[in-house]
Swiss-Prot record:
Residues 198-245 are annotated as: Disordered. It comes from the Archaea. The keyword Ribonucleoprotein applies. The lineage of its organism: Archaea, Thermoproteota, Candidatus Korarchaeia, Candidatus Korarchaeales, Candidatus Korarchaeaceae. Part of the 50S ribosomal subunit. Forms a bridge to the 30S subunit in the 70S ribosome. This is Large ribosomal subunit protein uL2. Residues 230-245 have a biased composition (Basic residues). The keyword Heme does not apply. Keywords: Ribonucleoprotein, Ribosomal protein, RNA-binding, rRNA-binding. Pfam families: Ribosomal_L2 (PF00181), Ribosomal_L2_C (PF03947). One of the primary rRNA binding proteins. Required for association of the 30S and 50S subunits to form the 70S ribosome, for tRNA binding and peptide bond formation. It has been suggested to have peptidyltransferase activity; this is somewhat controversial. Makes several contacts with the 16S rRNA in the 70S ribosome. One of its GO terms (biological process) is cytoplasmic translation. GO terms for molecular function: RNA binding; rRNA binding; structural constituent of ribosome. Belongs to the universal ribosomal protein uL2 family.
Amino acid sequence: MGKRILVQRRGRGGIQFRSKDHLKIAPARYPQDGMDNLMRGVIKEILHEPGRHTPISLVELENGQEFYYIPPEGVYEGQEIQIGKGAEVKTGNVLPLSEIPDGSLVCNVEIRPGDGGKIARRSGTYAIVFSHEGDKVILRLPSRKEKLVDARCRATIGVVAGSGRIEKPFMKAGIKYYHERTHPKRWPVVRGVAMNPVSHPHGGGSHKRPGKPTTVARTAPPGQKVGHIAARKTGRAKRRAATKR
């Protein structure tokens, strides 16, 4: 009788591979009704959500509506923020890209107007408003690539809070264990060549190499689909091609 390998179990979606939804507070998105008018609000709380690499802030608007958004560095509880057209260009405020000057650092940028924010949401990240071209704006992303987006898309002025998160070492495996438990994945990750042959196609033998070609077809069965899946190139030729780019 065969044995299902780890990638098959992950694809089935057992409880250890699922997101810990009961630990989540709420999605961090901009309100839908703040596209064409100016709204004011107050940051009521700055919270920590397990599994999220940034703080999350609860904002209460003048009309009593509440929403959560990703705070930039420098904001504090009780601070007043502005959202929408005509807002002041100030850290923590949310404006359409058409009203943000060139060279400004922004975070939680929308890709499409009204989607709530998709770009530069991780701790310490930001995008740069590179230039304005009519009804479009060129953004320089954290990856240094440039992207053309609609000028009506909203963004938060500033850099996402928590920039020094990765500078502190874990020091102990137990701390790392509890950190990884909040994420929808299994940890630690074991190499296939370190497994038994019954657990992985690369396992077995008194050596730490696969012992067979690691390229498999796109149409391979699930128990065989590990390694370089439908790879055009592997090895030195692939590295040389990447260097030339």
